[in-house]
From Swiss-Prot:
CDD domains: DHDPR_N (cd02274). It comes from the Bacteria. This is 4-hydroxy-tetrahydrodipicolinate reductase. The keyword Nucleotidyltransferase does not apply. NAD(+) binds at G7, A8, K9, G10, K11, V12, G75, T76, T77, A102, P103, N104, F105. The gene is dapB. The lineage of its organism: Bacteria, Bacillati, Actinomycetota, Actinomycetes, Mycobacteriales.
Length: 245
């Protein structure tokens, strides 16, 4: 399988280039960065592209890849419901193309989201705290937003979080994602971390995941690269690849 990387000179992208080059069953074709022509992916007969770029360019990248029949594994964040809908519309005209978008490729992070979804209905209160390096463009993170949505869906028949706050500074209680408070921290020295805090009578439960290095994303990305062509259309998350759905 011939694999290219968009954002190849970025910190995550460079890690992905090394991972593809080290894999015996994959061939690295080309790396594309800002200012480079996307046509290089076609010229090198690339089968699958790994995209770790920026929310401002990822949609143009996807339109090009879909139009040219190149499968995409996307770790770039910033996907709103509207963006997801747009990708689905593009894919409707290219039924042979496959796009997999995941808010997080770290296996532990995916498992922590799954565990949080399972725990959600057993606790009265829940809040999410995500912590990242200060260069991250979006807040809350895609992982935190997805975690909150999964928790909210699991709690759909439960009362809302108890919270008597009536006054306070704007933003002090975090962002509201489907009724779940999500707090974002940006701090030098961090990579990617998340805590989900549950509370009920007499006890609390914390589910925490830490990506200490960007290589934590490699196993999930390579799994997606190897499997994406088997799932035409749009897939969100790698949970199905791990038999978690």
């Amino acid at each position: 399988m011939r694999v290219g990387v968009l954002g190849a000179k970025g910190k995550v992208g460079a890690t992905m280039v090394q991972a593809v080059e080290a894999a015996d069953d994959l061939t690295f074709t080309t790396g594309v960065d800002a200012g480079d022509p996307l046509s290089a992916l076609v010229d090198t007969r690339t089968d699958v592209v790994i995209d770790f770029t920026h929310p401002s360019v990822v949609m143009d990248n996807l339109k090009f890849l879909i139009d040219n029949g190149i499968h995409a594994v996307v770790g770039t964040t910033g996907f709103t419901d509207e963006r997801i809908s747009q990708v689905q519309d593009w894919l409707a005209d290219k039924p042979e193309s496959a796009v997999l978008i995941a808010p997080n490729f770290a296996i532990g992070a995916v498992l922590s989201m799954h565990f949080a979804q399972q725990a959600a209905r057993f606790f009265e209160s829940v809040e999410v705290i995500e912590l990242h390096h200060p260069h991250k463009a979006d807040a809350p993170s895609g992982t935190a937003a997805r975690t909150a949505k999964l928790i909210a869906a699991a709690r759909k028949d439960m009362p809302p979080n108890p919270d008597a706050t009536s006054t306070g500074l704007e933003g002090a209680r975090g962002a509201d994602v489907d009724g779940i408070p999500v707090h974002s921290i940006r701090l030098a020295g961090l990579v990617a971390h998340q805590e989900v805090l549950f509370g009920t009578q007499g006890e609390t439960l914390t589910i925490r995941h830490d990506s200490l290095d960007r290589t934590s994303f490699v196993p999930g990305v390579l799994l997606a690269v190897r499997k994406v062509s088997e799932r035409p259309g749009l897939s969100v998350g790698i949970e199905p690849l791990l038999d978690l759905t």
